[in-house]
From Swiss-Prot:
PANTHER family: PEPTIDYL-PROLYL CIS-TRANS ISOMERASE, PEPTIDYL-PROLYL CIS-TRANS ISOMERASE E. This is Peptidyl-prolyl cis-trans isomerase E. The N-terminal RRM domain binds to nucleic acids including single-stranded DNA and RNA homopolymers poly(A), poly(G) and poly(U), but not to poly(C) nor double-stranded DNA. Binds most strongly to G-rich RNA species. Residues 137-293 form the PPIase cyclophilin-type domain. InterPro entries: Cyclophilin-like_dom_sf, Cyclophilin-type_PPIase_CS, Cyclophilin-type_PPIase_dom, Nucleotide-bd_a/b_plait_sf, PPIE, PPIE_RRM, RBD_domain_sf, RRM_dom. It comes from Haemonchus contortus (Barber pole worm). PROSITE patterns: CSA_PPIASE_1, CSA_PPIASE_2, RRM. Pfam families: Pro_isomerase, RRM_1. Transmembrane segments: none annotated. It catalyses: [protein]-peptidylproline (omega=180) = [protein]-peptidylproline (omega=0). Inhibited by cyclosporin A.
Amino acid sequence: MAASNFPHNKKRTLYVGGFGEEVTEKVLMAAFITFGDIVAISIPMDYETGKHRGFGFVEFELAEDAAAAIDNMNESELFGRTIRCNFARPPKATERSSRPVWADDEWLKRYGKGSGIADAKESNGSASTAKGLPRVYLGVKIGIRYIGRIVIELRSDVVPRTAENFRCLCTGEKGFGYEGSSFHRIIPKFMLQGGDFTKGDGTGGKSIYGPKFEDENFKLKHLMPGTVSMANCGPNTNGSQFFICAEKTDWLDGKHVVFGHVVEGMNVVRQVEQQGTPSGKPQMVVKIVECGELDPVPQTEPQENEENSDPQTPMDVEPQKETA
């Protein structure tokens, strides 16, 4: 989305930094549109290299939407990199014009903090080129209305067995899988759970390795909305059920195996979340009507999101059901 010529508004314009070369204005739009109407997006280019500088600007129509975006997106993960999201600093009053703030080279030098790509490498450690992680999609219907696809990148570099289980259940190559199953448990501001393709109520499902398989590791954490993790009914009871986090859920760290994150379709996740209730029973039937594998996108290797944190007490749940 091209930037329009509007004056900078410090309460509506966000600085987003630290993302990798694969991020485009379209990607930023998809990541931030869930918080409200967007006026303009711009990613300044380095005309010497022909590449962007690893940061950009997003202006919202409403100040409260901009604030919500900061609350949810600052220090979140985008294509495997931890990004920063704050209000953009305005230029001096004497420098104001009809141009957007990011069109001012002096502003970029002073407040752009150089290359956001370099910042990302510093925060994530050394970045090495990867062949690309597997990506799968879930096409979702609410009632009779198709609302779109959720695209998930699988962390086969950290949890290969868990990632392969989910990939195969998306493709159906083992003769069974997620197509036609539902999100049977949806709790707003927490998570949406699905993957029970045998019973549909949270008591069924199976993995490609047998009824259950062991917890692979807990290196990846529940740090942000869009995190995808295995549901279970205790240690080493992973099957096919999974959940997508609607918010940061760090009390689940060390109890559930994180194996991926949503890279496209968070707007679909939010629409599904709206069908939830405090009890978890969806207001309408939410089904996965199509699923499969996409071509991987070559990119810089994502960080593993390892953190040392003390898990909090998990929610009380019915023991016979797999839960988040």
